[in-house]
């Protein structure tokens, strides 16, 4: 219990408990308004659902027609034209979950407007936790508790939901919202209007759960009050369960008005064991209810007092009517027969919100008006649906920062940002989260579950957001636009990263060397240089990499996949960066310029490498011999000298090489290809370096100079070999006798002494 109490702070707990208790009390105008505002199932949605759920089999129409009608009803309810498959599935699961909840819990959970089944589960769990914590307190405060339950306190902690289930056999009367006359007078107009809607919503909720076996009289009264008048005129309807009875005549009202009409209040009482009574020709109608709160029974069923004047009697009734309801119906007292036509000229149907509705609605007419914003509607269900938008206004405020939320569950999740509370822990790795939804997403890493599938390419994703982002690759949608340069992006994160190009912001700092980066991913990649961590391993050759992108690129060597194709020449490449580099050969674009010497490059990486020739920076160091390099690829190539790795193998002769470029050059020996041609003499070469060296014979250029003796060379390799004279370095050692040499050619000649091979002239 101590562990569970840490999961939720006292503020969240008190808010949920207060709401739970106030919802159960159902007393006072505040509770009535909350009951109405938090009603989830509106009449129009429930009507579509009930039409589908309760569709009877038409014997005369036949099975094919029945199936067609059933399909049409289902489409009206689920609306697949605006809902995805996942949303429809979530709707069905949420509906069934709310259905199986105990009555009081279901009412409270619905009042929180859960948008998903996961959110509904969280609400039930949080409520369960609070009620379990409240149970021991209530038991200690109670002084007149009978004999202690032999099951102990644990009986409530584990069985309170079951106790509610045992009380599930409720009637429409059990969910009625009753208020007193004093409460009614204290309510604001908007509260009174919303109070009326709760009857219809409660009724449809009961029907959806299969708990209502007949349609109470008050339902058609509220849905179509002009039909009630018609029912009064034409006689009782078995469908409404009305019962016509003789009633003791009330004082003759004809004296009260020249037009022989009188007023009847169709009581907005929410007790549903109603009986509609009639006194006969020219008589008065009244609705009897089992009196709860206030009702017409307390107004109209009084004995006639002959000592009171008729006008006084009428004034009493009239005042009571206006106190208790906004629904006043006048109808002609001259009922010569049951089929007499209602006198529209004299009749008025005065409803504060809905205007005149006793007659047929004309085209373009909108008789139903919202008292909150004044918007008008043609249909009553549309008004109910609209009023729910006011009901869903944010009402839960964070005491720390003042932010408001529509759902209390959202407030609870938000407050954990302030407290740092992370109650949801992964049993696999121990990682904790502030929200259950985040834990669910995280657990898919362990299970490998990817429930969201792209309909275009079939690719699966673990998160819906990832699927949405992926689908933009098919649609080409780029909704995020840079205000500086107009460039658009498919991801908001890409836009944020791009904007740092304009601002120069580099918020991510390496704690080891102080280097800054514009993107967090670049910092993470950089930090692996310090740690030497390489968590990504190739299953083919067991080579390890520091980044997942490097592993993906490497795996294309084994698969031979070349998924990036040039639209100009059709050439395919294994890496997107290689394609981008290649495309510059068509455009000739060199947008990256060195600020020191003005040299231009087609790639930013080439510019970065070039800068190091000015700065002398060599950040890549060999851990074996300590030699440093300006480029990571040079370090990788150098390390193969120590480990002897030669991953690039010729498919024709089987010869292996440390570098892919060397293999490419070698394969030209088999093909005879010499792609590099001298423009001066027409001589062709296999290697570009050979062409560069050859061209210096025409130009006389000797760009490589020794710092010791100022001697010039046309080739870098010649300079390196020369510098070993000054340093005395002999890097080439014979593995048999250990003798060292300054040049590799000298080592090769020496090794023939051991092998007996003769040099070929």
Swiss-Prot record:
Disulfide bonds: none annotated. The keyword Aminoacyl-tRNA synthetase does not apply. Keywords: DNA-binding, Metal-binding, Nucleus, Repeat, Transcription, Transcription regulation, Zinc, Zinc-finger. GO terms for molecular function: DNA-binding transcription factor activity, RNA polymerase II-specific; RNA polymerase II cis-regulatory region sequence-specific DNA binding; zinc ion binding. GO terms for biological process: positive regulation of DNA-templated transcription; regulation of cytokine production; regulation of transcription by RNA polymerase II. The keyword Transcription applies. May be involved in transcriptional regulation. This is Zinc finger protein 287. It comes from Homo sapiens. The lineage of its organism: Eukaryota, Metazoa, Chordata, Craniata, Vertebrata.
